[in-house]
Design a protein with these regions (language model features):
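Acidic, divalent-metal-binding catalytic cores of TOPRIM
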Residues: 1-150
Length: 150
């Protein structure tokens, strides 16, 4: 089971090959963490959101790796993997596109994280196209995320 924060996370997961039935959408990082505390053997993907308060659950996790803008933690007691996208999905996607030499503007998105964050929910089909374009380039960052969540 993959626990996610928001609709753009769901689009990303589905485009990377995670079945819809295997995704649980929660509305924010705190709710994802609460759900993790009640389950066993899940994977979660959340934004780091460094400027916001962090759920206490995150302090109980053990770091596994930190590469490609993804910090991976595990919860040994509950057998969870928590993938933290740094700093937020939007900035991570912009950096991933730049690394792959794909222009996010070609898909109607701004190169600025806050602007992309504001628009992303109204452009989910374009987000899917962007992710598919990144997959076609064999983006190392995106393929790393795919291995972690799929």
């Amino acid at each position: 089971m993959l626990l996610l924060e928001c609709k753009p996370d769901e689009v990303l997961a589905h485009t990377l090959g995670v079945a819809r039935r295997d995704c649980l959408h929660h509305n924010d990082k705190g709710r994802v963490c609460n759900a993790l505390q009640k389950r066993q053997g899940c994977v979660a993907m959340i934004d780091e959101d460094p400027s916001s308060a962090q759920p206490p659950y995150l302090a109980t996790l053990v770091i596994e790796s930190d590469q490609h803008g993804l910090r991976v933690f595990r919860d040994p007691a509950r057998q969870h993997r928590v993938v933290i996208v740094r700093p937020r999905l939007e900035e991570w996607l912009i950096a991933t596109a730049q690394h792959a030499q794909v222009q996010v503007a070609d898909f109607g998105f701004s190169e600025r994280g806050n602007a992309m964050h504001r628009d992303i929910n109204s452009k989910l089909p374009k987000l899917e196209e962007l992710i598919e374009a990144l997959l076609c380039t064999r983006s190392v960052r995106l393929l790393h995320l795919q291995r972690l969540i799929a």
